[in-house]
């Protein structure tokens, strides 16, 4: 009898990972990273530029084209206390594109750093965006699990919420890097094919691809398709429960074009998902399809 996955102990997934084995910064040329090969029971190493040589001709590769947003907003209180408001998911409006286009007001579900210091309902910060001086106000609303509803308001209709994030926000890099965000991260912590803004973390399996690797894949006859999954708060939220059942999972936004779905259905060869975000999008797509077929 298979074990109920809800009762799997988190401790079974613990393993040592020395800090010195974690690269704090990427290589100057991202496709020169190491490539681990497991083939016919043998393990070997290569460089990432060699990837096309290991993949079957005629394969279909699926990439996640999400783009990381500068989701960390910092407010300094008069007492000197620093409070971080980490934007996770748009609430009003709940569509990412519409929310980024908002002027004057937008609401997000946020994680709050140093919450105990946020005693008044509102935080304010003055800034200059696109040459306009504005005052950004953050009002804390109801608590939803470990997150809070936060209303953002500003006093200039020429400025969008996307503008505010671009100027005021900080890119969220993984906590295991144990370093502050740097200006170079705005480029290196994005995939070269990132397009659709919305993630709070990069789909890291795609970070090693470069235009020359993508060109080499296509030259071999490998078809490239894209979908979107905006990586959510689960990336940063530690697992504190002893069993999987006790861990709160966050939902994530996905979008797959009709043309991509048709290619997936019609494709008879090998389908290769780049990273776990692409995998769980495809798994969710299948689940949604089965559910709709059974309950039209």
Label each residue range with its predicted role.
Residues 1-296:
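A cross-family signal for N-terminal binding/gating loops and helix N-caps
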């Amino acid at each position: 009898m298979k074990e109920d996955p809800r009762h799997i102990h988190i401790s079974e997934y613990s393993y040592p990972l020395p800090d010195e084995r974690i690269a704090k910064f990427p290589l100057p040329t991202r496709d020169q990273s190491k490539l681990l090969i497991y083939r016919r029971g043998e393990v070997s190493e290569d460089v990432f530029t060699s990837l096309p040589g290991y993949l079957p001709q005629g394969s279909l590769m699926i990439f996640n084209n999400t783009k990381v947003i500068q989701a960390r907003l910092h407010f300094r209180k008069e007492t000197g206390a620093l409070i971080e408001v980490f934007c996770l998911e748009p609430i009003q409006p709940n569509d990412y594109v519409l929310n980024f286009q908002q002027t004057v007001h937008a609401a997000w579900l946020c994680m709050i750093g140093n919450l105990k210091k946020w005693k008044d309902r509102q935080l304010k910060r003055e800034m200059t965006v696109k040459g306009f001086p504005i005052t950004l106000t953050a009002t804390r609303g109801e608590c939803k699990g470990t997150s809070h509803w936060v209303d953002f308001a500003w006093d200039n209709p020429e400025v969008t919420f996307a503008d505010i994030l671009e100027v005021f926000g900080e890119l969220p890099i993984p906590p295991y890097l144990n370093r502050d965000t740097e200006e170079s991260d705005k480029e290196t912590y994005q995939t070269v094919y990132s397009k659709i803004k919305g993630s709070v973390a990069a789909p890291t399996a795609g970070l090693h691809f470069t235009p020359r690797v993508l060109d080499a894949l296509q030259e071999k006859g490998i078809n490239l398709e894209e979908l979107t999954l905006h990586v959510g708060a689960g990336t940063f939220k530690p697992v504190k429960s002893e069993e999987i059942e006790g861990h709160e999972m966050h939902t994530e936004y996905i979008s797959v074009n009709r043309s991509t779905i048709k290619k997936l259905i019609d494709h008879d060869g090998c389908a290769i998902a780049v990273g776990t975000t692409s995998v769980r999008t495809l798994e969710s797509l299948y689940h949604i399809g089965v559910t709709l077929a059974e309950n039209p």
